[in-house]
Regions:
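C-terminal globular interaction/adhesion domains in large, modular proteins
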Residues: 95-103, 113-118, 145-419, 423-424, ...
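Beta-strand/loop motifs with alternating small/hydrophobic and polar/acidic residues, enriched
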Residues: 2-168, 172-175, 180, 185, ...
């Protein structure tokens, strides 16, 4: 059987195949073109986004530069300021970037009271004609003067860094800096509005040196008026006087830390207090030598004396030099011998003079606390419960961290809490001024939210901050006449300790630094007249004051920087006016409203 034979149309099949290949190639080409187009669009979009991001970031820095310059008023006390409202933007070549507009705003955010510092935010919005937006936020913080380890407006030509000085923390001067050939090491950044006029090769700048930097003006006395208002809210504004010498005052503030909860320490946040003493006799208040010292020595001192012991009654009674001879010893009880044998001197009104707390001792009086007395204080059974001014929000809800004195004030004691003490007159360091938790203690942590073990004190004087030349700080001859080294230390320690950041619109200095003993108290292995001056904090002043001399009078400096002030400056402490960079953030542009944003992030 024969099968049929089919005829094949080969030209037709070839045509179909060619058409199919053309379709495939066309599809591939179209896909390639589409992919290329998409890639171009993506690249274009990315480039555009990069431009918007750069424009927004530049806006942040431009606003910060303006509020740090002549336009500081752009930063408001509350709300926000519109700095740019849809302005065109230029690139680095000076050409306008087509289709791009920028909106920038600045205002306070976070805690806006200023108690813990001045904080703010800058918002920068870059937008193109298509409505695409990039929104950036920068946190800024106004720089506190407390951040400086050392600051001067004017450097004396006869004082320089040297003798192996080691300075931790930031240093700035608005004047030329000089270095002696004995050398100095600066462990923090150093800046000067002038230059290092001499001795630069004798210095080590571990974090760099900036010469011809911008000048930083000291705060004005008007800053004191602001602090007065905050102090009045918490019953912490007091009236002193300008009576007495430069290192004498009629008003004395004593810091006290009290264990309220019986846990064996005084570091809890509600355990800080002050007592306030007033007298018409400034010599008595600060334990100066009597007015007739040149004739009679310490014979008539009410501050200096020694203890009489009654072994039968197991009591000790302080008897001043003025009250000698004292029964039952009578004539055998010499005032001079009493001072030479375990003599002590105390500030006016001290419990140690009277053996107990005396509200009114006839020479002066302790000022009563005008607010309610906490049951926690009453429970301690202290005789001075009604005279303790709480320096914590727990026991004094209106306390803003500020104590204010109109006039001069003498200070001493143990500080528990965050406090700024401001005075229109001199602030006199009458005795040791220490934190409840030593600044070098491993228990101290100023970076966490817990205020325990975290003490900070700022001293702000409209004039000088003076270490008193009194019978406590300075070894003194019982008799003014005489020669040789018959000086006696009537203090409980052979040095002076100050835990505080110091800001004086004139000077920080030691009264009569160039007189008195030269080798009575040791500072380490070195004999000095008054021993070591231990200061932990910073010194900010118009011009440098002296604390001692090379022949041994006064103190030997032992300064160290308190890094805690970088995180937690004293309340309402004056600021330099300069805003420093903080963190930057991206903000979702969907539904963003600038007014609502500043309202949300501002708190009282």
């Amino acid at each position: 059987m024969m099968r049929p034979k089919w005829e094949h149309d080969r030209p037709g099949v070839a045509l179909v195949l060619v058409l199919f290949v053309l379709l495939v190639v066309g599809a591939v080409s179209a896909a390639a073109a589409l992919v290329g187009s998409n890639a171009w669009l993506i690249n274009f979009y990315d480039d555009r986004q990069s431009v918007l991001e750069a424009v927004a970031d530049a806006g942040l820095e431009e606003v910060r530069a303006r509020i740090n310059g002549a336009e500081s008023a752009l930063f408001p006390d509350s709300g926000y300021t519109t700095v740019e409202n849809g302005v065109s933007v230029k690139n680095v070549a000076g050409a306008t970037i087509p289709g791009v507009r920028r909106f920038t705003y600045v205002g306070p955010t976070g805690s806006t009271t200023g108690q813990y510092g001045v904080f703010g935010s800058i918002i920068s919005i870059a937008q193109d004609r298509n409505g695409d937006r990039i929104i950036r936020r920068a946190e800024v913080t106004q720089e506190s003067f407390a951040r400086f380890a050392y600051f001067t407006d004017v450097e004396p030509v006869d004082i320089a860094f040297g003798s192996g000085d080691i300075i931790d923390g930031p240093v700035h001067s608005n004047d030329n800096i000089r270095i002696y050939d004995s050398g100095a090491t600066f462990r923090g950044p150093v800046s000067t509005a002038g230059v290092v006029a001499s001795g630069k090769n004798y210095a080590t700048f571990q974090q760099g040196l900036e010469e011809r930097a911008a000048r930083i003006p000291l705060p004005k006395t008007a800053e004191l008026d602001k602090l007065k208002g905050y102090a009045q809210l918490g019953n912490m504004a007091f009236t002193g006087s300008m009576t007495g010498g430069e290192d004498q005052a009629t008003l004395r503030i004593e810091f006290i830390a009290i264990d309220l909860n019986g846990d064996g320490d005084t570091t809890d946040r509600n355990e800080g207090f002050i007592r306030v003493y007033y007298s018409n006799d400034p010599r008595w208040v600060v334990a100066s030598v009597p007015s007739d010292y040149s004739t009679n020595g310490l014979r008539n001192s009410r501050n200096c004396g020694h203890y009489h012991e009654d072994k039968k009654a197991n009591t000790r009674t302080f008897v001043s030099a003025r009250d000698h001879p004292h029964p039952p010893k009578q004539q055998s009880d010499s005032w001079e011998a009493s001072l030479n044998s375990h003599g002590r001197c105390y500030l006016g009104g001290s419990d140690s003079i009277f053996g107990e707390f005396v509200p009114d001792d006839g020479l002066g009086r302790w000022i009563p606390w005008p607010g309610p007395i906490s049951p926690l204080v009453t429970a301690t059974g202290r005789a001075d419960s009604a005279y303790l001014f709480p320096i914590s929000r727990d026991l004094n809800p209106n306390f803003r961290g500020v104590i204010y004195v109109d006039g001069k004030v003498a200070v001493s004691g143990v500080v528990r809490g965050h406090v700024t003490l401001a005075a229109t007159g001199n602030i006199i360091i009458a005795d040791d001024l220490k934190y409840a938790t030593d600044p070098g203690s491993p228990n101290r942590d100023c970076t966490d939210a817990d205020p325990a073990n975290d003490d900070i004190l700022g001293l702000f004087s409209g004039q000088d901050i003076v270490v008193a030349d009194n019978t406590i700080n300075t070894p003194t001859r019982p008799k003014a006449s005489g020669s040789g080294n018959n000086y006696i230390s009537f203090d409980d320690t052979p040095e002076e300790t100050i835990h505080a950041t110091i800001l004086a619109l004139n000077q920080f200095r030691v009264q009569n630094h160039a007189s008195g003993p030269t080798n009575v108290e040791k500072c380490g292995t070195t004999q000095r007249g008054r021993g070591c001056l231990f200061l932990t904090g910073g010194v900010i002043q118009r011009t440098r004051g002296a604390v001692g001399t090379t022949n041994g009078t006064g103190y030997l400096k032992r300064y160290s920087y308190d890094g805690c002030v970088m995180y937690s400056p004293p309340p309402y402490f004056p600021t330099t006016g300069r805003f420093t960079r903080g963190r930057n953030f991206d903000i979702d542009p969907v539904g963003f409203d600038v007014a609502a944003f500043f309202d949300l992030l501002s708190s009282q």
